[in-house]
Swiss-Prot record:
This is 3-dehydroquinate dehydratase. The keyword S-adenosyl-L-methionine does not apply. InterPro entries: Aldolase_TIM, DHquinase_I, Type-I_3-dehydroquinase. Involved in the third step of the chorismate pathway, which leads to the biosynthesis of aromatic amino acids. Catalyzes the cis-dehydration of 3-dehydroquinate (DHQ) and introduces the first double bond of the aromatic ring to yield 3-dehydroshikimate. Keywords: Amino-acid biosynthesis, Aromatic amino acid biosynthesis, Lyase, Schiff base.
Length: 204
């Protein structure tokens, strides 16, 4: 059983929020820039490059963002040039050219579960990613498909379940990342990062 990396999700509403990264004791801090009212410049993130995961989550994927494809493609490509880790949706990659090697490629299933064939295709297409992250709603059969995803090397997987302990327990099947929150949950069922860290410290 491998310990997942703790990702502490931090909504960034203004560039000043970014300085909080240095005080958050997690493996990675996810900067949720889709909450931003005043967008930071990519260069502003450089001092925290080794500690952050940048996410611009579109509304259709469960986020707060309303970005044009051109803006998002340009911003992510700037992050790539600076060597900053980011999350990019598989749905976005299907229509735009963005580097995904050693990045997080994500897919979210709100109203249905993916088939095994879809899962296989995601991991084959994005095999060079740092991790392929799949989140599924707790529909009938969700535990079975999460168990299948857990067999994929380097995968990240989670249920959109209101039960934080189930989310944590499922991550112990071998998920590379465990998403948590800093101030308030950015997704259903997240634990506070310090609570997740306390539990994992007892187990590992």
């Amino acid at each position: 059983m491998n310990r997942p990396l703790i990702v502490a999700s931090l909504p960034v509403t203004s560039p000043g929020d970014i300085s909080r990264v240095k005080d958050i004791d997690a493996d990675l801090v996810e900067l949720r820039l889709d909450y931003s009212r005043e967008f930071p410049r990519p260069q502003d993130l450089l001092p925290y490059r080794d500690r952050i995961l940048v996410t611009l989550r579109d509304r259709e994927e469960g986020g707060q963002g309303n970005f044009t494809d051109n803006f998002k493609e340009t911003f992510l490509n700037e992050l790539m040039k600076l060597g900053i880790l980011y999350d990019v949706e598989a749905s976005f990659l299907s229509r735009r050219r963005v580097q995904f090697r050693e990045k997080v490629v994500s897919a979210h299933y709100f109203h249905r579960l993916p088939s095994r064939e879809e899962v296989d295709c995601l991991f084959s297409t994005y095999r060079e990613a740092f991790t392929v992250k799949i989140a599924v709603s707790n529909l009938p059969g969700y535990r079975e498909i999460l168990s299948y995803i857990s067999t994929k090397p380097g995968s990240t997987f989670m249920p959109m379940s209101p039960d934080p302990l189930e989310r944590l327990a499922i991550s112990l099947l071998g998920s590379r990342l465990l998403y948590t929150y800093v101030d308030s949950p950015t997704a259903t069922g997240q634990l506070h990062y310090l609570e997740a860290k306390r539990i994992l410290n007892c187990l590992f």
